[in-house]
């Protein structure tokens, strides 16, 4: 290794210490690593790795990557790429608008590790702040759409539309296999819908929205406002199509709904769209939170997360994720969707935008946008230029002008570019000018001069040109939360009050197995708010985004070097989306060979729930493969099922190391077997943190792999998103990666439709992973993998005498995570894995992953970023909890199995200071069971949440303030 923690001070190379970041990222220095190795019986790292990682999979060469760069040098190099991005003022529209994120929200949410380092709120008691923010988001969506319920975000508008189509088929009573799509939808939305429909066997019929009245469709999707900015009243059309048992979905601009009649008022069953306009930068396509609102009767068919109101064991109002039995981690191939992570951080930002501005503020912003567009249209109309014609009289923000000829349209378009403005071309002679929250007086002068040769000032009076029949008459955002925090002090304190209710990685380790909660370094996060990365439209002209594309290309090369694959697609904007894109490439590949019937997907029974859910979305038949007693794929069963389904075998989905936390010795044999029978190997990259620099998935036989940039490559989890799931693939699959109708991908075939709304998915967070790889360098990345493996084995060794470690490799070693078995303890004492998870909160820790991949277990993944001291605190907590369980069993000090600190956990401050303490253990035992807790106590804000009550009494909107009193 070329990295030294203590470089010499007699050379400038040593004094500069370019690899310093490596030891900022790693939790243990060389001396501490030696202690960890010694504790598990090793003198050096090499011997430990030889016992842990099977020799047949090892990569015995350096990664083809540069050496580590310092934080300053990496930022400087990224700055040179950013400087090669031209940030024109965007008037493109097409689903993306410039915004102004309030500074108080940017600094205290987007840039705050208390918000962005948290995990999906499965442990509700230590996630009440994030859950409340998501409930606010849902309330915004409910108010603006007029529907009864809303989810806690989807990935983007286009994938939300595809989910709406799938939901329509589940809910509709029509037996039709046709889905109608309004020809006024955005091109990227239709692109993703076409992708999704194909493998379900649904026919997508595109036409004028009025034509939907006469057909037989299981569902219909209408755009409101249309791609040309036009506003149409859909009431009559919706009423007509519903008579034919057609389920109606309306895609709506969230900002327009502040002024316009709601989709529910027009009869819609579902309303969906993007909330990007609520303060989220365009970011070259993302990330942004899509919204999805629906009726109460359809709640069990809706995709994605839903936050609901419940109560805790003390009878207090508490929030939780509701109706989880619909989701992939429980229902697997029967799930409504393969959605795992969504866009929680972005949903929280959008919801806070509404909280900060309130109903009056958002109405002022929406009215200003519309008034700008109206004033601009008036200038064009009053110019009396026969060449210029305003196409639509009823619009919200976009004015479409027919220039009479392609020549004039081109001239205006190019002149706009020359003075720093981007317009949008619609056909040969039409231009669209989309106004936004950022439009100002100077813009108005320049834009009017471009079209009518004379600059015009804004008129004194702001005019609403929409007919009154289009305008909403009901009140919105009436809940107190939207009417209480309009000064910065009040907003600042509200945000802080929510942050303090949540346990994130700025408080303690989050050792969730299969989730890789590692450091999200500050220097990695800085570039996401640079205007060059934040404020670029995804459909901006290519010559303006040279630096952006260079950064993405550079990241692709980094990922190719790490994985060994020939090409990488950056479009999937989550791990689940990456799975979908990977299987999509496999199916398209088989079709290119004329093997359209290769539709069987073999999946080990230990697989992530997203795997079978994704396979079903691709129209594949899931065949489950057994695992043996050691947690490995049962080779005999795999062989038998490969032979049985040989003629139809499409793919094997496999995770490596396995979800059981071990390196399977036979992975090459497994891949060879699948290839022998004509199938392709899809590798789930969830556990890639055990691979980097140690092995290459392409080398062991994988054909395609998705990479969770929000796990292995340091994009933060954001409390449940954003994520990125790019796929690496071998050359024979590269032509079949997702393309994009508006921004073609270099190697993809023209007819390969998209999986995400934007060509590069959530592009604005890609600099995070670029920075991580650049600052770690080839040697640092390998060191990270080594330490991730070491930390997991240290935890396993320390706990094995207290809880059985369920699976190990042939030398007794685990990979980067370990599974401890709680079932023997439960059989002996009745104490469950859930009791331990809740009690860990009293010790200041988030629970490891519960009951996956084996029910009644905890899966622990400590990552390389955790120090030995933090590991020891966590270990001592679990040892103490075991002692508490045994004390309850023994009945010591009047403890019983029905009344002890575990079954009553977590303990809130309110419980501990209550005047009447009725428990058989002390208040100190409840709240401060170990000495270290006194210096950094985290108080859960609610007691144990009643899950059953929440699902039986589903409430997904903001409760009244009295509920919290």
Curated annotation (Swiss-Prot):
What keywords are annotated for this sequence in UniProt? Oxidoreductase, Pyridoxal phosphate
InterPro entries per the UniProt record, alphabetical: Aminotrans_V_dom, GcvP, GDC-P_C, GDC-P_N, GDC_P, PyrdxlP-dep_Trfase, PyrdxlP-dep_Trfase_major, PyrdxlP-dep_Trfase_small
Catalysed reaction equations from the record: N(6)-[(R)-lipoyl]-L-lysyl-[glycine-cleavage complex H protein] + glycine + H(+) = N(6)-[(R)-S(8)-aminomethyldihydrolipoyl]-L-lysyl-[glycine-cleavage complex H protein] + CO2
Cofactor(s) essential for the protein: pyridoxal 5'-phosphate
What GO cellular component entries does it have? cytosol; glycine cleavage complex
Q: Which GO MF terms does the UniProt record name?
A: glycine binding; glycine dehydrogenase (decarboxylating) activity; pyridoxal phosphate binding
Keyword Oxidoreductase found: yes
EC numbers? 1.4.4.2
Q: Does the keyword RNA-binding apply?
A: no
Q: Which domain of life is it from?
A: Bacteria
What are the GO BP annotations of this UniProt entry? glycine decarboxylation via glycine cleavage system
Q: Write down which residues bear the modification named N6-(pyridoxal phosphate)lysine.
A: 711
Q: How does it assemble?
A: The glycine cleavage system is composed of four proteins: P, T, L and H.
The task this protein performs is described as: The glycine cleavage system catalyzes the degradation of glycine. The P protein binds the alpha-amino group of glycine through its pyridoxal phosphate cofactor; CO(2) is released and the remaining methylamine moiety is then transferred to the lipoamide cofactor of the H protein.
The entry assigns this protein to a family as follows: Belongs to the GcvP family.
For this protein, the record's NCBIfam families field holds: gcvP (TIGR00461), PRK04366.1 (NF003346)
What name goes with this protein? Glycine dehydrogenase (decarboxylating)
Organism for this UniProt entry: Psychrobacter arcticus (strain DSM 17307 / VKM B-2377 / 273-4)
Q: From which lineage does this chain's organism come? A: Bacteria, Pseudomonadati, Pseudomonadota, Gammaproteobacteria, Moraxellales
